[in-house]
Every structure is written in C-alpha cells, then in structure tokens.
A protein has these predicted regions:
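N-terminal export/assembly segments and adjacent metallocofactor-ligating motifs
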Residues: 1, 22-26, 33, 40-400, ...
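Non-catalytic alpha/beta scaffold blocks inside enzyme catalytic domains
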Residues: 307, 311-593
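Residues embedded in well-ordered beta-strands
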Residues: 18-20, 203, 412
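A short, compositionally biased
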Residues: 14-19, 196-200, 592
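An alpha-helix initiation/capping motif
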Residues: 10-13, 161, 288-292, 426-429, ...
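A basic, amphipathic helix-loop patch mediating RNA/tRNA/ribosome contacts
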Residues: 1-24
Length: 600
C-alpha cells in the first residue's frame, strides 16, 4: 500500500490520502493508516476504483510540486518519484501557476526547499514525539499551509538530521551533502558508529573512497532507526588535518620520514630504555583488534604491563563485567517504571539512550529522577540535590527515593562517568550494589545497575583487561616517571611533557600529535574493519568503507610491523589470526566469569 505520511515510529496523521483502500459496505475509499482493524472487515487494496483514487491523489500532490528531479538531492531515493511512476500521469491538466513557498532557515545541517513539501508532517511529528523539541509546526490552511520553525531559527535538537531521512520528498535535505553525488553512484557499507558507546548501526556511503554521508540502519535493540547529528555529520572531519605520512621531530619541527626510519628510531629507543619506564595508553576510538595487538605488543615484545585505556582516573572494578556495562540493555529502558540518573546527562553523552528514556516516559509515564539539575532532557524529571550525602542516604535506605526504588518492579539506575570520578565513587558504587542485592532487585531477568560509558572503546578495552588495576599509572605519568610514552590513538591524556619520548599513533593531527616526537599515521574508523563492544556489552563488527590517505596504515598493521622490526617476527600472520586470538582471549574470560558475548 503506497503512503507518504505514515511511519511506523510516528503517530497516525492520515493527511496524504495516498493509502486509500476499498472497504466493503463503505460508500467511499478509506485511509488505511487511520482505519482500525475489526472482525469481519473485508479490505481490497488493489481494485480499479482504488487505483483511480490513488491516481487522483497523486495528481493533486504533483499539481504544485516543482518537478525539479534533475537538480534535487532526493532524486533516486524519493518516495514521490517512485510512486508517481505507478500512479502518476505523463501530462498535467494543471495549467495555472504553481504555488511558491519561501525556504525556511533550519540551521547549518538541514537544507530546505519548501516548494517541494507535500505536507506529510513527518518532520513535525518526529520533532514533537521522538526528539522532544516541538520547534517545527504547520501554519496556514489549504494551499497556504507551510511547515516552519515559527521564529526562523535553527532546530535545537541533537536528532534533527533524522528529519532528512523521514522526508519522503526533497523538501528537507542535508546541507553538507548538497550536489555531492547520486545514490546509485555511492558504495554502501554497513558498519558501526563510534561517536558514542551506544554502537548505533549505520551505513557509510562513499564516492571514489571518500565518505559522503552516514545514514542509520534499523536495529530495534540499539538505535531503532535514528542516529544523532554527531554520528551523521562527524564524517566531514575525515578529510581535515589527516596524518598521511610518518613524522619525526627535529629541533621542534616535524619532518617527513619513511616507515623504516621511524621503526628503527623506535626500536633503538625501546632497546635502550628500562621496560619499567615504558607505558602505553589506548584511545577512545580504537577497535578491539587494534587494542588487543597493542596490549600484546607491550606484553610480549616490550615485556611491560604499563598500559591503560582511561585518560582520567575513574573507579572501575573490572573484575566483574556487570560493574561496567549497561545491564538492563538499551531496549530494557522501555520496561522500567522508575529511572534514576546519577552523574550523567544522557542527552549529550548518549543521545539514543535519551531518546529511549523519552519513549519510556511517553508510553509508560515512567518516573524519572536525576541527582542534580542537568538542564532540558526533553522529558520532565525530578531533580534532587546531588551531593555525596544525598547519594549515601539513598543507598542506605534513608531517603524517600529508597522506598520508591524498593517498591518499583523494574527500577533502572544509570551511572555516569562523572560520578565514577569522585573520590568516594568506590564506596558509593559498592553501597548501591549492596542496596540492590539486599532488596532483591538484581536477578537473572533484570539488573537495574547500568554504567553509561561515553566512548566507543571503553567496554571493549575493559573486556580485554587494558586497565591498570593498581590505579597508579595516570598519577605516575603526571609525575613524569616514564621515559617513553606510546599514545595509541590517545589525545586526552592530561599531563605536562618534560623529557619523555612520546610516540603518537593516530589518524588526525590532534593534541597527541602536537606533543609527540614521532608520529605514526593510522587509519580512521571508516578505514579499517574491527569489532566494538557497545555499552550494553554487545560485540558488533565495523566494516571498512574507505582507505587511509597517503602512506597511512591500519592500526593493527603498524603494531605488527613494529613488532617484526624489533623481534624479527610478527605478532600475527594476518588479521584473521589476530581476530581469532582476540576471541579466544574473550572465551577464556567467558569460561572464567560466565559472561555472554554477543557477536553481530
């Protein structure tokens, strides 16, 4: 059944009239999207009468449409274009002037061509219902109706780009993608987003190996069919400030070098340095294969266990997996009847989590409480004083909220990383676990304890034990106790360099590259395949969509080649052996800790 206004994730509008069907005993066709099903109902979806009705509706839709398909970015994936092939006519009977609607300013991300709009109101319903930002609406009636932002301002939503995917015509398109390519010219690669720890499923479209756009893939358990604007538009940074060749610093100036030169210098430095004075830090965006081979390189080649995946001291008891994952699962948010947020702002830390919380509020009127006021979260919530004593009182059953948690069937507690960075985090975290266990809230079916990781690599690195269990490494780096520091995609390490020799491996000329003595150009997240573990502990594979620029290599390959230069033997013969070894390591943990690893 053809349709324009209907969408399974939005409320019923019934205003395009394209989904007309014939219902027995009804004097005229009915809109199937708005007609409730009933016993004994006889529906005919494809009769001459219905085909004529749909052709009439299509003629009305095309009457005021500019028919500018050759210059429209929606061309090739346009619902109106496709359906007009079935129900359109080759000659218009409309001889009058077509209406012209002024384009609206919706900000730097959404390009508007409102003359093409067919008033399906999908964008309006999405902004109001899913995004929770009712800044889009319709004014006027009939031919004078217009979709507008009322005050001619940017749409203030971190989900705004989804209206581009929802728009069935070319009225709303992507500004950065204007006139870049046609859909049939693009190579499409299904992969995983790394802009946060949610692990949204995405499709990366490339033209001549250049990433042109990022679109969502439907995964009801994770991101449904939405993605954040950060996910959608971060790809424009893949062309800027890229590292495309190795560099060596001479007299405070970087000079280009060959891979052989930098490998020899690194080998010489490492061989002449006590292995206890060497450490490595893994970055936030590294895939699990790259992190694992880096750990193996430090373990086996350099013989040091000075490695860490955190850039700021954060309490994490990684001995048990439930201590650092989102145990209730992302789709479990919709089942919760009470949500408590501690030290987190999900709207900006994990946009898709915030969208799920809003969905839970709309569908179940879930009560939401936050320690501290964190601003507008697109749903109403109760704000409590978030000092340490308040948290302590809640977990020791000395607060009204304690009783609400105990009385709720499925409470859900979200702990942010800012909470885990306070001095008393260990005590409060363990108090929370004891409180939940004492009141029998943790079971095999439901675990309300959820840690909201911010970065894509966090859970995977913890699964691979890339963490300093003594919790001293970050302090020792600040005290300049190491002679060689290997920054493996790590740009956020907070320390002042003195005499350390710093090796930086990464894809962009970021903060880590500025302080480095040697720069090794690596691949970005779209330029190498690898696995990522999202915040709920689900392992998913990201696939290679393009190639690294210049002489840059994939991260695992750089480490493998460096190990060969140092020991005359590679750590792994190929990527498959590396992947197999990594999963064997995880399987040993699975047997030891009885954990379940899910692989896409």
């Amino acid at each position: 059944i053809p349709r324009f206004c209907y969408h399974e994730k939005l409320s019923i509008a019934g205003n395009c009239r394209m989904c007309l069907v014939e219902m027995e005993k009804s004097p005229k066709p009915v809109a199937s999207c708005a007609m409730p099903a009933a016993d004994g109902m006889v529906i005919r979806t494809n009769t001459p009468k219905i085909e004529k009705s749909r052709k009439g509706v299509m003629e009305f839709l095309l009457a005021n449409h500019p028919l500018d398909c050759p210059v429209c970015d929606q061309g090739g994936e346009c619902d109106l274009q496709d359906q007009s092939m079935f129900y359109g006519i080759d000659k218009s009977r409309f001889k009058e002037n077509k209406r012209e609607v002024p384009d609206k300013n919706m900000g730097p991300l959404i390009k508007t061509q409102m003359t093409r709009c067919i008033h399906c109101t999908r964008c309006v319903r999405f902004a109001t219902e899913v995004a929770g930002v009712p800044e889009l609406g319709a004014i006027g009636r009939g031919e004078d109706m217009q979709i507008t932002t009322y005050l001619e301002q940017s749409v203030q939503s971190e989900l705004s780009g989804n209206v581009i995917d929802l728009c069935p015509v070319g009225a709303l398109t992507s500004k950065p993608y204007v006139f870049e390519a046609r859909p049939w010219e693009l190579k499409k690669t299904e992969t995983i987003d790394v802009m946060d720890a949610v692990g949204s499923n995405i499709r990366v479209d490339t033209y001549d190996w250049e990433v042109k756009r990022v679109l969502p893939i439907i995964n009801e358990d994770i991101n449904e069919e939405w993605i954040s604007d950060k996910t959608r538009y971060a790809c424009d940074g893949l062309l800027n400030q890229r590292l495309d060749t190795p560099y060596i610093k001479y007299n405070n100036k970087f000079e280009k070098a060959s891979w052989e030169e930098v490998y020899k210098i690194i080998k010489s430095k490492i061989e002449n340095t006590n292995n206890k004075k060497i450490c490595g830090f893994v970055g936030d965006l590294c895939n699990m294969e790259a992190s694992f081979i880096f750990k193996e390189f430090l373990d086996r080649t350099i013989n040091t266990r000075n490695y860490e995946s955190r850039s700021i001291k954060t309490f994490i008891d990684s001995s048990i997996r439930e201590n650092y994952i989102f145990n209730s699962k992302i789709n479990g948010i919709e089942e919760a009847d009470l949500i408590l947020m501690i030290g987190t702002n999900p709207r900006y830390e994990a946009t898709m989590i915030n969208a799920r919380i809003r969905k839970a509020f709309l569908n179940k009127n879930t009560k939401i409480v936050s320690l501290n006021n964190v601003g507008d979260l697109t749903y109403p919530y109760e704000s409590l004083d978030g000092n340490t004593q308040t948290v302590k009182d809640i977990f020791e059953n000395n607060n009204e909220l304690s009783k609400k948690i105990i009385n709720s069937k499925k409470p859900l507690i979200i702990i942010g990383e800012s909470f885990l960075r306070i001095r008393s985090a260990e005590y409060l975290f363990n108090s929370l676990k004891d409180f939940l266990k004492k009141n029998e809230k943790i079971s095999s079916e439901w675990n309300p304890l959820n840690v909201l990781s911010v970065d894509a690599g966090t859970v995977g690195n913890l699964d691979l034990d890339i963490i300093d269990r003594n919790n001293k490494l970050l302090d020792e780096v600040k005290e300049n106790k190491f002679e060689i520091i290997y920054l493996f995609g790590q740009d956020n390490l907070d320390f002042k360099k003195k005499d350390e020799f710093i090796i930086y491996q990464g894809s962009h000329g970021d903060r880590g590259a500025e302080i480095a003595d040697i720069i090794l150009p690596g691949a970005a997240y779209t330029e190498q395949s690898g696995h990522y573990t999202n915040l709920e502990g689900k392992i998913q594979k990201a696939y290679k969509a393009s190639y690294p620029p210049g002489d840059a290599k994939e991260d695992w390959q750089i480490i493998n080649d460096l190990a060969e230069v140092m020991n005359n033997r590679k750590l792994f013969n190929d990527k498959e052996e590396l992947e197999s070894s990594m999963f064997n390591y995880l399987k040993l943990k699975k047997i030891k800790k009885n954990q379940i690893y899910q692989i896409k």
